[in-house]
């Protein structure tokens, strides 16, 4: 007998230069699944706002929506995956999260951010390889052990470079057969994989 699809609320966190509209295709695929979906808008001023501050904002928005204890699933795309992970590890989100899906997120940093000055674009600088934020998150990820963690990445990603390092230090990881960063949230092959991960319980 197949298990029923989960009805836990799902939170979708967008990335740099994106808005919640990014998830429209995914949300259409989820219609009829009887689960609440929340896609908050996190203005980041072109990457100037530190990711910890955005994670704090995310915490407040989730609590406004479902209080402090409702169990959720979380999916973050690109920078949104690092924001989501920061919320999980530093703002207590792991205590209430069943599943975390990181999609094309620079969890180990990205070379494309290396030359960006932190004084001007603090949020972008948080995604440098070896940034203080990523060193902290990767140095102690014990809080993620209670969460089902899944990473999806594009090998040829030019936004998160190298693409194969856009993975969490724990859980499963899958290379998606697409050619670009944005196709991770738009290509049917990628959407199929995401839907499968979201619906299996």
Predicted regions: what is each one?
Residues 25-26:
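Short amphipathic alpha-helix
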Residues 107-191:
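The alpha/beta-hydrolase serine catalytic core
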Residues 10-14, 21, 31-42, 48-145:
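Serine-dependent carboxylesterase/thioesterase catalytic core
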Residues 3-9:
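Proline/glycine-enriched tight loop/beta-turn segments at coil->beta junctions
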Residues 13-16, 154:
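Glycine-rich His-Gly loop
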Residues 61, 65, 193-201:
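C-terminal alpha-helix
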Residues 18, 46, 182:
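Glycine-/small-residue-rich active-site loops that bind phosphorylated ligands and cofactors
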Residues 54, 185-198:
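Post-His helix in hydrolase/transferase enzymes
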């Amino acid at each position: 007998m197949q298990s029923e699809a989960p009805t836990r609320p799902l939170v979708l966190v967008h990335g740099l230069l994106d808005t919640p509209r990014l998830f429209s295709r995914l949300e259409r695929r989820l219609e009829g699944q009887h689960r609440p979906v929340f896609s908050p808008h996190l203005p980041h001023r072109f990457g100037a706002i530190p990711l910890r501050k955005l994670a704090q904002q995310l915490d407040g928005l989730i609590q406004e929506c479902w209080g402090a204890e409702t169990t959720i699933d979380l999916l973050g795309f690109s920078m949104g995956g690092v924001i989501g992970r920061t919320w999980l590890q530093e703002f207590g989100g792991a205590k209430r999260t069943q599943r975390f899906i990181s999609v094309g997120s620079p969890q180990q940093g990205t070379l494309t951010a290396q030359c960006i000055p932190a004084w001007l674009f603090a949020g972008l600088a948080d995604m440098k390889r070896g940034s203080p934020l990523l060193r902290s998150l990767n140095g102690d990820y014990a809080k993620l052990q209670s969460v089902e963690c899944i990473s999806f990445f594009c090998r040829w990603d030019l936004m998160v470079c190298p693409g194969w390092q856009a993975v969490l230090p724990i859980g499963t990881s899958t290379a998606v057969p697409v050619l670009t960063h944005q196709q991770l949230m738009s290509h049917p092959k990628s959407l199929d994989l995401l839907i499968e991960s979201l619906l299996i319980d």
